[in-house]
Curated annotation (Swiss-Prot):
HAMAP family linked: EF_Tu_B
Lineage summary: Bacteria, Bacillati, Bacillota, Clostridia, Eubacteriales
Residue numbers spanned by region G4: 136-139
Keyword Hydrolase: yes
Name of the protein in its database record: Elongation factor Tu
Limits of the tr-type G domain: 10-209
Length: 400
């Protein structure tokens, strides 16, 4: 019997299954929960429980995603699985489900297919740092040479997208066979393969750096003046820790960042000596005038982030049914880019040979925005027209 409550003492890691349609992502997810449930590390979830993924909205975009959780001896995992290919594209681009690592499911019987390639490309573009391969349906392949061939193909494909193809663990097995058996034993022919997979995930995907250990950053949501005390910027601390007396910078919307010192931290009308990632705070800033800071800028640890105006982005364009545009857009399209808390107008350059982009498409674009924004690779944004979301994107590389 699984413990009702997960102990939160173990390090937490976010993973997800990716891969071509019908290669067995959901079946394998169900098999992981069943096998681990035998060791008290999960509540077994049936295929159809996972498959009927609830719809969620992220940045105005509807995505169907299933979340399961489980634990191994060393870690607690949150695992996402999506029913449809479009859901994966949207999920990865919006960052609705940030992945510290992915389990790439490839059918041994079919080898890599078009969506296998697309998901690897997406993982590279949106910054999924590690991939472990589950070579599913291994029960359907009798020829060891064929298995070897498929494995080579997968390694080449991973290397092509700058993943370390030669080092990535590839674990053969069968989600379906493990589900049908369900004994959960490490010695079992099929359940043991699921344990092999989890051991690889445990050892190959590193524990991510916690948000509090990263350099301080807080998007400015609002600014006001407290008579006799100075200017206060409010917002939710995105990462890191801010202590009273820290030197920080105001970054974005101006050419050069502006240095200041945080002279007070307030939360729920109480004064604190520090705040950390996740806290909603007001930060009192020394020598900053009300007009020197505005929504859309960020407060950040000095030197940790710079303002930029030109970047490439991986973008998903909403379909008409999702409330997006009804018509395609062309080169020099000028929407607003919504970064963190503000809209900035920009101009879009399409890749060579792309005439236009249809609603529902995924595309890599180059953008130039009219005001600099504190930006780094992996930053998510929405594309809007007059306040209506028509696309979602992620910064892939910064040009200037």
């Amino acid at each position: 019997m699984a413990k009702q409550k997960f102990e939160r003492t173990k390090p937490h890691v976010n993973v997800g299954t990716i891969g071509h349609v019908d290669h067995g992502k959901t079946t394998s997810t169900a098999a992981i929960t069943l096998v681990l449930s035998k060791a008290g590390g999960a509540v077994a979830q049936a295929f159809d429980q996972i498959d009927k993924a609830p719809e969620e909205r992220e940045r105005g975009i509807t995505i169907s995603t299933s979340h399961v959780e489980y634990e191994t001896a060393n870690r607690h995992y949150a695992h996402v699985d999506c029913p449809g290919h479009a859901d994966y594209v949207k999920n990865m681009i919006t960052g609705a489900a940030q992945m510290d690592g992915a389990i790439l499911v490839v059918s041994a019987a079919d080898g890599p297919m078009p969506q296998t390639r697309e998901h690897i490309l997406l993982a590279r573009q949106v910054g999924v740092p590690y991939i472990v391969v589950w070579l599913n349906k291994a029960d359907m392949v009798d020829d060891p040479e064929l298995m070897e061939l498929v494995e080579m193909e997968i390694r080449e494909l991973l290397s092509e997208y700058e993943f370390p193809g030669d080092d990535i663990p590839i674990i053969p097995g069968s989600g379906l066979k493990a589900l049908q058996c369900g004994c959960g034993s490490r010695d079992c022919e099929w359940c043991g393969k699921i344990w092999n997979l989890m051991d690889a995930v445990d050892s190959y995907i590193p524990t991510p750096e916690r948000a509090t250990d990263k350099p301080f950053l807080m998007p400015v949501e609002d600014v006001f003046t407290i008579t006799g005390r100075g200017t206060v910027a409010t917002g939710r601390v995105e990462r890191g820790v801010i202590k009273v007396g820290d030197e920080i910078e105001i970054v974005g919307l101006t050419e050069a960042p502006r240095k200041t010192v945080c002279t007070g931290v307030e939360m729920f009308r109480k004064l604190l000596d520090q705040a950390q990632a996740g806290d909603n705070i007001g930060a009192l800033l020394r020598g900053v005038d009300r007009k020197d800071i505005e929504r859309g800028q960020v407060l950040a640890k000095t030197g940790s982030i710079k303002p930029h105006t030109k970047f490439t982005g991986e973008v998903f364009v909403l379909s008409k049914e999702e409330g997006g545009r009804h018509t395609p857009f062309f080169n020099n399209y000028r929407p607003q880019f919504y970064f963190r808390t503000t809209d900035v107008t920009g101009v879009v350059t399409l890749p060579e040979g792309t005439e236009m982009v249809m609603p529902g498409d995924r595309v890599t674009i180059t953008c130039e925005i009219i005001s600099p924004i504190a930006m780094e690779e992996g930053l998510r944004f929405a594309i809007r027209e007059g306040g209506r979301t028509v696309g979602a994107g992620v910064v892939v590389s910064i040009i200037e």
